[in-house]
Amino acid sequence: MESLVARFDALQEAILTHIESQDDTLESQIRYWENIRKENAIMHFARKQGLTKLGLQPLPTLAVTEYNAKQAIQIHLTLQSLLKSPYGSERWTLPEVSAELINTAPQNCLKKGGYDVSVWFDNDRYNAMVYTNWDYLYYQDVNEIWHKVKGEVDYDGLYFTDHTGERAYFTLFSTDAHRFSRTGLWTVHFKTQVISSSVVSSTNTPSFDFEEQQLPGPSTPTYTELTQASPCGRGKSRESQPTSTTSPETSGLRVRRGRRQRKSGPGPGETPSKRRRGGGRGGGETRLESAPSPGEVGIRHRTVERQGLSRLGQLQAEARDPPMILLKGTANSLKCWRYRKQNSSNCGFLFMSTVWNWVGDVSENHSRMLIAFKSPGQRDSFVKHNLFPKLCTYTYGSLNSL
């Protein structure tokens, strides 16, 4: 036990000597973290043996010593990898390779030259948040190759442009805007620059109305028209009166997908031109279904009911599949873009999927995301009024149901 205490004291002495020396080479920082690694390994071993002290040094709990030891191992290996890169010969101080800085956003990146970015919510300097950005960020890609990039700022948040040319956001101002802002607007101040909402207003999605397909019960699915645009196509809707028998894209037209209208006469209190089901959830007016035109293919988002439809009627109903857009790009750019669209006041789509990828796809832009629409017209309007992420591609498609 005395030898263990002696080794522990020697390591602590070496650590203190390094701190006082203020050496700024990466080799010296690697030696420092090697000593930290050994120190935590000894403390963890002593704690497992039931000891609470090593000499006069109290020992933390077993969980703490295990965490500190693993963290020291990770940083030690990271610095050894950095030493083999072109940036290993740069000046590196002890604070720049500290665990606290590495765990600061963006995590697992080395950082140099921090500066403040002040965000004034509602353009009020007394209602502000201060964020930290960095002149330079060092990170490893999936192939363990080191890259040096600049920390950048725009109206949305703090980011860096990775080696593929994509923006990787590590701080989004909208997160705090939901808590502190009344208007949802803010002004960004950093160094000698100011970014306000008026500067980026030209890139905002213009407001436009769109039709929505309601999701009623399975007995009487109907089309409805929005009284007001909802954030993501789930706003309050009202029934509209049938005005024609053209395609379901016509405003106010109601299309029947339930059982065929009975040939019997109207019941009490009903007119020959209108028949309402009292027991259906939707309570909508029913119309005979017509054959879909080429422009109507792709407007449905629910599975067609099997009962009460002839073979021809079922084929006609199934022809209207929900139209889709398949986005292809990097995971980070698609996630940031989806976050902005879901928090936008005018989404203009029906549903948006999470970011996913095909198993075994190792290409650079392997991530995928699906966007569903209620009609091809809504899809065309979405493409017209929205900008997709940089280097992102898209293609059209449709599904039998969602």
UniProtKB/Swiss-Prot annotation:
Cross-link Glycyl lysine isopeptide (Lys-Gly) (interchain with G-Cter in SUMO), sequence positions: 328
Chain's gene name: E2
Region (Disordered): 201-303
Skewed-composition ranges (Basic residues): 254-263
Entry comment on modification after translation: Phosphorylated.
GO biological process: DNA replication; DNA-templated transcription; regulation of DNA replication; viral DNA genome replication
Function of the molecule: Plays a role in the initiation of viral DNA replication. A dimer of E2 interacts with a dimer of E1 in order to improve specificity of E1 DNA binding activity. Once the complex recognizes and binds DNA at specific sites, the E2 dimer is removed from DNA. E2 also regulates viral transcription through binding to the E2RE response element (5'-ACCNNNNNNGGT-3') present in multiple copies in the regulatory regions of the viral genome. Activates or represses transcription depending on E2RE's position with regards to proximal promoter elements including the TATA-box.
The protein's name: Regulatory protein E2
InterPro entries (alphabetical): E2/EBNA1_C_sf, Nucleotide-bd_a/b_plait_sf, Papillomavirus_E2_C, PPV_E2_N, Reg_prot_E2, Regulatory_protein_E2_N, Regulatory_protein_E2_N_1, Regulatory_protein_E2_N_2
Location relative to the cell: Host nucleus
Listed Low complexity bias regions: 240-253
Gene Ontology CC terms: host cell nucleus
Assembly mode: Binds DNA as homodimer. Interacts with protein E1; this interaction greatly increases E1 DNA-binding activity. Interacts with protein L1; this interaction enhances E2-dependent replication and transcription activation. Interacts with protein L2; this interaction inhibits E2 transcriptional activity but not DNA replication function E2. Interacts with protein E7; this interaction inhibits E7 oncogenic activity. Interacts with host TAF1; this interaction modulates E2-dependent transcriptional regulation. Interacts with host BRD4; this interaction mediates E2 transcriptional activation function.
Region (Transactivation domain) location: 1-202
Segments of skewed composition (Polar residues): 216-230
Source organism (scientific name): Human papillomavirus 65
Domain of life (superkingdom): Viruses
Main localization, broad class: host cell
Family of this protein: Belongs to the papillomaviridae E2 protein family.
GO MF: DNA binding; DNA-binding transcription factor activity; nucleotide binding
Keywords: Activator, DNA replication, DNA-binding, Early protein, Host nucleus, Isopeptide bond, Phosphoprotein, Repressor, Transcription, Transcription regulation, Ubl conjugation
Annotated segments matching region DNA-binding domain: 321-402
Pfam families xrefs: PPV_E2_C (PF00511), PPV_E2_N (PF00508)
